[in-house]
Amino acid sequence: MSSAPLLNGDSVLSDHSNELRLVQITDTHLTGSADGVLLGMNTERSARAVIDAAKASGPIDCFLVTGDIAADEQPHAYAQLEGLLGTDTPSLWLPGNHDDIRTSFASFEPHLKRRLRTPFWDVLMLETQVEGEVGGSLNETELDALSAAIDEAATENKSLLIATHHPLRSMSSAWLDEQTVRNAAEALGRLGRYADRSLIISGHVHQASDAVVSGIRMLTTPSTCVQFAPQSKDFALDDLQP
């Protein structure tokens, strides 16, 4: 992780109905080119199809982009994503292990907010990237942000949604379980007192899952491109579409 916090400030949604509609976009693996391909799939075309389908399904309050925007640290991938998302709907971004936060990623400051605040929910963005590593961790800055968000949500009687790139639980997949948040137990220990009002969403694992761990519901979301086979010992692809 970078020494200075990448994520700062709040984005506020104060004028909407009791229903909050968030769309998670994750692991786009864009290259900055319309011709970029990952494992045989054109990543711009697949990301565009997913985003367009989400927009067509109804109004969206905010996109939550949970990392691996770039396929391999390509600096133009971030403008490419911004173009796909458009300007009509706000979006908050996290880096993944394939993103280089030292380059152009950090220049997209409007998307790098720590929290999305609404009347009934707070959304907390936590950075799990560890520079030079595939797996993730939460440093003290991120853990402190978690503790502060729990305190504020409790004081204001709000539910709390936490977004990360790396998941905070086992995926029952040997090769992926080496890449989860290595100090997840510490984070979940802090969250335990607010477990019944909390939800964690993550990316990285290129598959859908829904589990309750330590009383906390945890979701992972498919990539907008290729999917990984669930519960596999070694790297394996699934034949599911995004």
Model-predicted segments: where are they?
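N-terminal active-site segment of His-dependent metallophosphoesterases
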Residues: 1-80, 171
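Binuclear metal-dependent phosphoesterase catalytic core
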Residues: 2-7, 16, 25, 190, ...
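Beta-strand-turn-beta hairpins that frame and shape the catalytic cleft
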Residues: 13-24, 115-125, 150-161, 212-218
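Acidic/histidine-rich helix-loop elements
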Residues: 23-46, 71, 100-110, 131-140, ...
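Active-site neighborhood of phospho(di)ester-bond hydrolases with catalytic His/Asp-centered motifs
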Residues: 24-26, 62-68, 91-97, 126-127, ...
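Metal-dependent catalytic neighborhoods of phosphoester/phosphodiester hydrolases
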Residues: 34-36, 65-86, 100-112, 173-175, ...
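Active-site-proximal segments of metal-dependent phosphoesterases and phosphodiesterases across multiple
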Residues: 34-38, 156-198, 229
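Binuclear metal-dependent hydrolase catalytic cores centered on His/Asp/Glu-rich metal-binding motifs
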Residues: 118-159, 176-186
